[in-house]
């Protein structure tokens, strides 16, 4: 039996572990997970769980991971926290008997986490929306006037962020206080934003971009070192409560194939697109499982299990079920006792 470790990562890992265990009828894999949260819900999904020490990062965390793999007889390590650093040190893990399933090389992972740098390298059939990198009020003003010539509405977001934190559509008519009182989320008043930037000499790198206001597509993917093995695209409804539609658009699948090849992507990852006035635009590549991985797998392929099996035994041996296009999927919350 292979012991497989998921270290601290995003909450979607719980769904992935459950999917692996459902498919692993012969009990060939024993799943170990760890977190700094003693009450992490993911502990209920795994065969075995462990508490990570808080505050560790960088090389200190890397050394802890090496020790953990040795002490717990880990055969396959699927890293979340410090994945880029761990990817660059795979040889050290392999030397002590642990194979590491990484989405990409250390350099590529660092690139994908910085949207400004990443966007500058993209060459595919659905490029990112028009953008400018700004770090001062003067740069913001110049970029604003340049982009507004061609685009009716703009948005802003950090170059480095997760979960969409820091994203806002820029409202030219209402103040931030008015937006707050009207319950408008993810918007900010233009004049308030200007005043805020002017009060700072410099600020963290931000992307001023064309706002894409159409349907968003989240594509959960399985790759084999640059070869796209499978992709399940979910079209998100613009109306709350209508779920998501499995939509295998040719242009999305082709762009995803191109990106997989260009960046040498491997295992499970997620690519996001959104429609705008000029067509489909690339939002980002998430080098990890998405929060909607469970919904994607309802369409047929059990992506977490296929990723593990392919990495362990070779992707050429995989039998990948056909994706059920047109399926409407969704998720509901349920009550549970915490560990």
Tell where the protein language model's regions lie, with residue ranges.
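ATP-binding N-terminal substructure of ATP-dependent carboxylate-amine bond-forming enzymes
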Residues: 1-104
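ATP-dependent carboxylate activation and anion-phosphoryl transfer catalytic cores
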Residues: 7, 237-240, 244-339
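Residue-level detector of structured alpha->beta connecting loops
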Residues: 73, 151-152, 264
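Residues that mark the start of a beta-strand
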Residues: 1-5, 153, 207
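Short, charged, surface-exposed secondary-structure boundary motifs
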Residues: 42-44, 59-63, 108-116, 164-166, ...
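Active-site nucleotide/adenylate-binding loops and adjacent lid/helix of ATP-dependent enzymes
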Residues: 109-206, 225
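Phosphate-binding site of ATP-dependent enzymes
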Residues: 180-259, 263, 274-275, 279-281
């Amino acid at each position: 039996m292979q012991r497989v470790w998921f270290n601290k990562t995003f909450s979607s890992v719980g769904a992935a572990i459950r999917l692996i265990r459902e498919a692993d009828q012969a009990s060939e894999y024993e799943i170990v997970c760890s977190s700094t949260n003693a009450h992490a819900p993911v502990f209920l999904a795994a065969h075995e769980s462990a508490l990570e020490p808080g505050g560790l990062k960088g090389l200190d965390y890397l050394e802890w991971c090496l020790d953990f793999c040795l002490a717990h007889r880990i055969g396959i390590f699927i890293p979340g926290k410090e994945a880029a650093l761990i990817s660059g040190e795979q040889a050290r893990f392999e030397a002590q008997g642990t194979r590491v399933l990484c989405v990409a090389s250390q350099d590529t992972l660092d690139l994908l986490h910085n949207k400004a740098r990443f966007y500058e390298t993209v060459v595919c059939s659905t490029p990112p929306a028009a953008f400018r990198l700004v770090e001062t009020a003067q740069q913001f003003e110049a970029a604003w006037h340049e982009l507004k010539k061609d685009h009716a509405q703009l948005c802003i977001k950090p170059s480095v962020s997760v979960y969409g934190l820091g994203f806002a559509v820029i409202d030219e008519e209402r103040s931030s206080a008015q937006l707050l009182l009207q319950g408008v989320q993810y918007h900010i008043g233009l004049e308030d934003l200007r005043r805020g930037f002017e009060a700072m000499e410099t600020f963290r790198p931000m992307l001023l971009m064309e706002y894409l206001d159409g349907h968003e597509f989240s594509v959960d993917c399985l790759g084999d070192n640059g070869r796209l093995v499978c992709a399940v695209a979910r079209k998100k409804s613009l109306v709350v409560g209508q779920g998501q539609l499995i939509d295998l658009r040719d242009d999305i699948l082709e762009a995803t194939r191109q990106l997989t090849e260009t960046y040498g992507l491997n295992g499970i990852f997620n690519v996001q697109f959104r429609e705008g006035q000029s067509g489909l635009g690339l939002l980002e590549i998430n080098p990890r499982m998405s929060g909607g991985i469970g919904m994607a797998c309802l369409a047929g392929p059990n992506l977490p299990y296929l990723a593990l099996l392919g990495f362990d035994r070779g992707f050429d041996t995989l039998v990948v079920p056909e994706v059920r296009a047109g399926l409407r999927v969704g998720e509901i919350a349920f009550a549970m006792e915490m560990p």
